[in-house]
Amino acid sequence: FPDQDDFGRVFYLNARMSAAGIPQLAAIMGNCVAGGAYLPVMCDTLVMTEGSGLYLAGPALVKAAIGQDVSSEELGGATMHAEVSGTVDFKEPDDQHALARLRRLAAAYAPPELAPWAQARSETRPPRAKEQDLVGLLPVEGGTKPYDMRAVLARLLDASEFDEFKPEYGETLITGMGRLGGYAVGVVANQKLVIKRKGAIEIGGVIYAEAADKAARFVLDCNQAGVPIIFLHDVNGFMVGKQSEQDGIIRRGAKLVNAVSNSVVP
């Protein structure tokens, strides 16, 4: 609930800076508990190192409050938040990799004195992967052969470099940052491979609830950063069925539609 001078003020300032278009990048490199857990999550992008914890209450308090025995990793570890909750955007093995990730992310933001999409251009570097291989990767017209969209991106983006956003979450859509012709770009692409995760199989080329949620957040992040978006799509549609409806496919799909409709970057 609202307050003026207590901890809610910190939340308020966090949210207002975001609304003002001030980029906020956060890294969790240790335990982040209780009210403080909200602050990094309210930032535009969140990086978390393995071995860290993010939860409203730690294992000891959970045990005392509701009698539940749970490990720190199960409750709020980096892997759980990267693969299950989707709270973490990038999981890194240690502090050094987390800081390197933050530097790469910050480098993609548009300088404030330029128009949002007038990115500082770096030297164009050809893809390391052979562009000619695209012919063999993609199915012929009308074909249904699965293919790996990451392999396609490796043949399109500068130096075949791609910083993937939430790679372990909502895996039927691929989102992330790269460069094209020296300019920073965001990429939203569908994955055509069959995804096996959490004991379930997800069909490539179909948008599931988690994937829609991820893509919507990424489109918003690109607009916050002033980064143009490239869409690579070979999509059959949104997933249907009982589980999909219970997962909120309509609500979360609508979030994606809304985010793309209100996007102002090229």
Can you annotate each of these PLM segments?
Residues 1-266:
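Ligand-binding clefts of soluble mixed alpha/beta catalytic domains
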